[in-house]
Regions:
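Catalytic adenosine-cofactor/nucleotide-binding cores of aminoacyl-tRNA synthetases and other
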Residues: 225-344
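Catalytic cores of large soluble enzymes that bind and process phosphate-bearing ligands
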Residues: 54, 78-82, 101, 152-153, ...
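Active-site cores that bind ATP or allylic diphosphates and position pyrophosphate for catalysis
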Residues: 44, 101, 105-234, 239-245, ...
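Predominant activation on well-ordered alpha-helical scaffold segments within soluble catalytic domains
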Residues: 26, 203, 219, 265-268, ...
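N-terminal Rossmann-like or analogous alpha/beta NTP/dinucleotide-binding catalytic cores
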Residues: 1-119, 214-227
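Alpha-helix initiation and N-capping motif
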Residues: 59, 83, 106-109, 122, ...
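Short helix-capping/linker segments at secondary-structure and domain boundaries
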Residues: 29-41, 200, 275-280, 319-323
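Short, histidine-centered active-site or binding-site loop motifs used for metal coordination
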Residues: 6-10, 46-48, 195, 199, ...
Length: 344
């Protein structure tokens, strides 16, 4: 069964980039269902392992925002409830020699990177941890240092056929072995995400192009763990008029847009086409929008997001509402209904 996932971190309110990722996953799955009639699944996974920054109110806001957008999910998971599973896999990888201990401090690692850059070399980790003797490790630990652990990348080409970017390939020799366990025993994003994708049967991963190098790393993790590698798609990131999406636009939350009177379908209709050559069409539901959605139509160029476009499109979306829907809203607000002549 085609299965996608959306994995927000409940460390703040959902912004326009988060909404776009969730929307593209929902539309991709629903388009596949429209074409084949086969069942699809959408997994909502809370990446809530950041114990200090993850808040219940932010998690609740994710549910509210997705429901407002009409984005439903079939399964809900929390990474904070799966820590034992991650530890189990880490222990297995240690036993197989695919994870090794390192003792550098953050300052020492930054010094290494600066030296490499000054010599015109890429800032790739030098695998010093692999060469440490047991005696040297004991010395470090006697100093009060605690190890972090890295996954051993194979120095070979990793390739995949991307749903948006086409053929992609990265050589593991040009990438640093990723940290998979921090000094305090917590887990960065990379390995738990792969474990979850395997355990939950994720078949397609659609996320921003800033994850492309992560994909090269994670494909090797899938292969080492014996999992089936999902299909990947990396749409380009949104930009503002001056290029990079400003902090103000990038952090624009759905609740702010809602407060401005923007319809959920206005956001959906714009984001589903922004970055494609397809014209923006007004649809009354995500199901209708999904019928003509094509992820492969997204280009490599980063699309420009301008909130003003939402305000231009919003009246068209409102006018597409049925009179019964409008009157139901007016009734909730204690306002008189409109008649057919007014709404025509």
């Amino acid at each position: 069964m085609l299965t996608v996932r959306f994995a927000p971190s409940p460390t703040g309110y959902m912004h326009i980039g988060n909404l776009r990722t969730a929307l593209l996953n929902r539309l991709y799955a629903d388009h596949a269902h429209f074409l084949t009639g086969e069942e699809v699944s959408f997994v909502l996974r809370m990446d809530d392992t950041d114990r200090e920054r993850s808040k219940p109110e932010y998690e609740q806001s994710v549910y509210e925002d997705l429901e407002w957008m009409g984005i439903s999910w079939d399964r809900l998971e929390h990474q904070s409830e799966r820590l034992d599973r991650y530890r189990q896999v880490v222990d297995e990888l240690k036993a197989r020699g695919r994870i090794y201990a390192c003792y550098e401090t953050a300052e020492e690692l930054e010094y290494k990177r600066r030296r490499q850059r000054s010599r015109g070399l890429p800032p790739v980790y030098d695998r010093e941890g692999m060469t440490l003797t047991d005696a040297r490790k004991r010395e470090y630990e006697a100093e009060g240092r605690r190890p972090h652990y890295r996954f051993v990348l194979e120095h070979r080409e990793t390739s995949w056929d991307d749903l948006v970017r086409g053929a992609c390939a990265y050589n593991g020799a040009h990438l640093s072995d990723p940290v998979v366990v921090r000094e305090d025993g917590t887990f960065p994003y990379m390995l738990p995400s792969v474990i979850d994708d395997m355990d939950f049967g994720i078949t397609h991963i659609i996320r921003g192009e800033d994850h492309v190098t992560n994909t090269a790393v994670q494909i090797q993790m899938f292969e080492v763990l014996g999992g089936k590698v999902p299909v990947f798609g990396h749409p380009p990131l949104l930009t503002g008029r001056e290029g990079k999406l400003s902090k103000r636009l990038g952090s624009l939350s759905s609740r702010e847009l809602r407060g401005e009177g923007i319809e959920a379908m206005t956001i959906a209709c714009l984001l589903a086409r922004l970055g494609t050559p397809d014209p923006i069409v007004v649809c009354r539901s995500l199901k209708e929008l999904a019928e003509t959605f094509e992820l492969s139509h997204f280009g490599r160029a980063q699309p420009h997001f301008d909130p003003a476009e939402l305000f231009k499109l919003n009246p068209r979306v409102l006018h597409a509402l049925r009179m019964e829907e409008v009157n139901a809203r007016l009734e909730k607000r204690g306002e008189p209904p409109v008649d057919a002549a007014f709404w025509a």
